Amino acid sequence: MTTLYDILGVNPEADEGDLRKAYRRLARRFHPDINPDPKSHEYMARINEAFETLIDEARRLEYDASISSNRFYREGRDSPEVRPLTITLMQRLTAHRTPVYSLSFDATSSALVSSSFDNEVFWWDPILPEPVRRHRLEGGSVAAVRAIDDEEVVAVGSSENNVSFWRLRKDKSTSWRLTNGEWVSCLSIAPDGSALAMGTVNNLLNVHEAKGGKARYTKSDHTDSVTALAWSDDSRIIATGSADATVRLWAAGSGALVQTINGVRSTVTAIAFSPASKYLAVAAVDLSLRIFNVATGELHRVMFGHKRPVETLAFHPNGWLLASGCREGCIRLWSATRGVGQLNLPASNLPISTVTFSPDGNFLVAAGLDRTIRLWSIRASEADE
C-alpha cells in the first residue's frame, strides 16, 4: 500500500521542515504550470493531499493510526511498544435465556453480576459454570446494573420516556419509576450507587438521585442527541457523548461544565474513564478510538481497528489496557497510553453489548446478543509510561 509518506518521499519520522522541503521539491517537478504531462494535475492533487494531511498534527495522528490499524500483537514479541499480555478463555456462561446487556463486578468480593433483556439478574462466582443466585426484577426493562457491594445491586432501565430504578438488597427489591418527558437514549449508574444519569434524543442530560428519583439537574448544552454516558470511578465526573461529535465533562454533584472536548469527528458510541480519571476513551461511528487527557481535553492517541461501531469500553485497573467490544462480535485490547493494538479476540458472530474487568485485574468478561458470558483470565503488566 502506498502511503502519504511514500507520496512525499519522506519517512514516518519526518518533521515539519522535512515535509516542507519535500513538498517544494515535488511542486517544482509536478506542478501543471511546469510539467506538460496531462496527468500532472492528478499528481499534484495527491501531493497536496499528502502534504496537507501530514503537516496538520491532528490529521497526521489520525492517519498514522489508520495505517497501523491491523497491527495487533501478542506478548510484546513484535513491537517494543507493546506491553506483555497473556489471556486465556476460562468460561462460557450460558444460563441467560435472552441477550445480556450489562455486567458489573462487586469490588468487595469480586462476584460478577449480569442482567439480561428478560430482567433476570444473575450472581456468579467466576470459577463456577452456573449462577450462585438469581432474581427477576418486575416492571420496566433493565439496561444497566451496578454491584455496590456483596449485598447490594442497583439497576436501571427505560422504555421510551419511562425510566425504572431498582435497588436489590439481600433479594429484597425496592423500585421507583418516573416519566422523563423525553425519549431516553442512554443510562448510567454512579459507581457509588448514589445517582443515575440519562441522556435523551432531545440533547439533554438528566441526573437524578438514586434514592426516590428526585431530579438533581438537567443540562442542554449538546446540540444533538446524547448517545453515550460514563462516570468517573469516584462518581465525581460525568461524561456525555453526543451525535454532535463532542464530549462534555460535568461535575456530577452540581452539574457545572468542566470540559468540552471537540476532537471527535462523528457520533460518539461509547465512553470510559481510566482509573483515577487520567484518560477518557471515546469510541465513535467512524470506527475510531480516541484517548483524551481529562485534565486538559487534549487528544492523546487515536486508534483504528474495528470494522463495525464500538458498543462498549472498559479500562483495566492498571490504567493502560483498554478493552473495546463492538457490533462485529469481537473484543479488542489496546495500549491506550501508547496507541497500539494488543490483541483481537473473536468472541461471537453477534454484537458485544458489555465488557468489563474484575477489580483485581485478573479477569476480562464480555457478553452480548448471543446470551453467552465469556470470561478470560488475564495477566497484564503494570502501567509504565
Report residues per predicted region.
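Residue-level detector of Asp-centered blade-edge/turn motifs that repeat once per structural unit
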Residues: A107-T108, D149-D150, P191-D192, D233-D234, ...
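WD40-repeat beta-propellers
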Residues: L103, V121-D125, V163-R167, L205-H208, ...
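Hydrophobic beta-strand positions that form the internal "hydrophobic ladder"
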Residues: L112, V153-V154, L196, I238, ...
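N-terminal J-domain/J-like co-chaperone modules of DnaJ/Hsp40 proteins
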Residues: M1-I34, R46-A50, L54, R83-L89
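Conserved strand-to-loop turn within each blade of WD40 beta-propeller repeats
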Residues: S115-D118, G157-E160, G199-N202, T240-D244, ...
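Short loop/turn segments that connect beta-strands within beta-propeller blades
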Residues: P126-P129, L168-D171, A210-G213, A252-S254, ...
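WD40/WD-repeat beta-propeller blade N-cap
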Residues: T94-V100, R136-V142, L178-V184, S220-V226, ...
